[in-house]
Amino acid sequence: MKKLFIVMIKFYRKYISPLKRPCCRFYPTCSQYALEAIQKYGAFKGGFMSIGRILRCNPFCKGGYDPVK
């Protein structure tokens, strides 16, 4: 499961992300955050952390530096 999520994120970063303008409000980007979270905490917890991060990445959030803890 962990490897599947990582492959999906890498596919997104290589083929889908270049087609749209940069819009992430955080550093590291949401996709990089997701990779790090899944590698560090596994598919279940890392996946939930990634979903939370993506939900926070919107025009109403200030953004900024937000590393995986």
UniProtKB/Swiss-Prot annotation:
Keywords: Cell membrane, Membrane. Belongs to the UPF0161 family. PANTHER family: MEMBRANE PROTEIN INSERTION EFFICIENCY FACTOR-RELATED (PTHR33383:SF1). It holds the Pfam family YidD. It is found in: Cell membrane. This is Putative membrane protein insertion efficiency factor. HAMAP family: UPF0161_YidD. Could be involved in insertion of integral membrane proteins into the membrane. It comes from Clostridium perfringens (strain 13 / Type A). It is a peripheral membrane protein. InterPro entries: Membr_insert_effic_factor_YidD. Its main location: membrane. GO terms for cellular component: plasma membrane.
